[in-house]
């Protein structure tokens, strides 16, 4: 039997992970990124951009449930949601499950990501692109948040790592723009890497976000194919009560929403804001 091909992630120089490739479904370099989707027996379809795993069919639900339901249920009455990135459609899928949301705007820099994900990762969007509340904007995220006249209750930055096209979504210009188009009491969240290996990302985001928001923190979730431990999500708002809501309040909102989740639940919501001591110490040691 011929040995299967292997795909090696290139995010880190001295260590990393690989996947056996059963079948390459799509591989093309666009104007912005090198995109590949392949099949793996353990994780189903895997999508990678510029040598870094972005999502897999098997564990994507953890990431998308936590990035969506934590801010939306903490907010409690979000009507207008902005997704930056998220071209695979899974973040959109989770937002559409909130029936009280009236409009969902997704800004994706690369139209190619959307088109090939609709074809090759249909389970991710699960038909959500056809939701009448949804609007797709092909634009740079920084440009959009600094130019739009729309305002939002929750902004979800489903960004890649701060390399290549995704780097701009970790800048002060982006965070300032998000604050500009966020309604009073609104919440901004963003993926912030695996903090054990990418701690500087969290520190840098915390420092920049603190210039624009009065309450900045992080919450976490364990996602197997994001190599290196616990994934960290940035959290920013001017309502410091939202990060400290009781499990009972979240439970009541969760039950009222009718959501059925595979990872998220109210107890996980509350616990996700408990950070490891090494991250707390690193954040506390930074100059104010």
Swiss-Prot record:
Residues 9-238 form the PABS domain. Pfam families: Spermine_synt_N, Spermine_synth. The keyword Transport does not apply. It is found in: Cytoplasm. This is Polyamine aminopropyltransferase. GO terms for biological process: spermidine biosynthetic process. Its EC number is 2.5.1.16. Keywords: Cytoplasm, Polyamine biosynthesis, Spermidine biosynthesis, Transferase. Belongs to the spermidine/spermine synthase family. The keyword Ribonucleoprotein does not apply. Homodimer or homotetramer. The gene is speE. HAMAP family: Spermidine_synth. The active site is at residue 158. InterPro entries: PABS, PABS_CS, SAM-dependent_MTases_sf, Spermi_synthase, Spermidine_synt_N, Spermidine_synt_N_sf. PANTHER family: SPERMIDINE SYNTHASE (PTHR11558:SF11), SPERMIDINE/SPERMINE SYNTHASE (PTHR11558). SUPFAM superfamilies: S-adenosyl-L-methionine-dependent methyltransferases. It comes from Escherichia coli O1:K1 / APEC. It catalyses: S-adenosyl 3-(methylsulfanyl)propylamine + putrescine = S-methyl-5'-thioadenosine + spermidine + H(+). Pathway: Amine and polyamine biosynthesis; spermidine biosynthesis; spermidine from putrescine: step 1/1. It is an enzyme of class 2 (transferase). Spermidine binds at residues 64, 88, 158-161. Its main location: cytoplasm. Catalyzes the irreversible transfer of a propylamine group from the amino donor S-adenosylmethioninamine (decarboxy-AdoMet) to putrescine (1,4-diaminobutane) to yield spermidine. PROSITE patterns: PABS_1, PABS_2. S-methyl-5'-thioadenosine binds at residues 33, 108, 140-141, 165. GO terms for molecular function: spermidine synthase activity.
């Amino acid at each position: 039997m011929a040995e299967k091909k292997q795909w090696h992630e290139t995010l880190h120089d001295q260590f990393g992970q690989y996947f056996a490739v059963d079948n390459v479904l799509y591989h093309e370099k666009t104007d912005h990124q090198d995109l590949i989707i392949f099949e793996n027996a353990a994780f189903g379809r895997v999508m990678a951009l510029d040598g870094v795993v972005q999502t897999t069919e098997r564990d994507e639900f953890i990431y998308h449930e936590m990035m969506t339901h934590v801010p939306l249920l903490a907010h409690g009455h979000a009507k207008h949601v902005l997704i930056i990135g998220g071209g695979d459609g899974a973040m959109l899928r989770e937002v559409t499950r909130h029936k009280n949301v009236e409009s969902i705007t997704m800004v994706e820099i690369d139209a190619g990501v959307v088109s090939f994900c609709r074809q090759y990762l249909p389970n991710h969007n699960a038909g959500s692109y056809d939701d009448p509340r949804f609007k797709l904007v092909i634009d740079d995220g920084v440009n959009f948040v600094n130019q739009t006249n729309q305002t939002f209750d929750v902004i979800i930055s489903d960004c890649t790592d701060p390399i290549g096209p995704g780097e701009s979504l970790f800048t002060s210009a982006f965070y300032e723009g998000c604050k500009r188009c966020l309604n009073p009491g609104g919440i901004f969240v963003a993926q912030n890497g695996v903090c054990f290996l990418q701690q500087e990302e969290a520190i840098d985001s915390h420092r920049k976000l603190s210039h624009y928001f009065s309450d900045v923190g992080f919450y976490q979730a364990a996602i197997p194919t994001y190599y290196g431990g616990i994934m960290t999500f940035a959290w920013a708002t001017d309502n410091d009560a939202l990060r400290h809501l009781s499990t009972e309040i979240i439970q009541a909102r969760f039950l009222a929403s009718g959501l059925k989740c595979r990872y998220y639940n109210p107890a996980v919501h509350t616990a996700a804001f408990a950070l490891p001591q090494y991250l707390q110490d690193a954040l506390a040691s930074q100059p104010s």
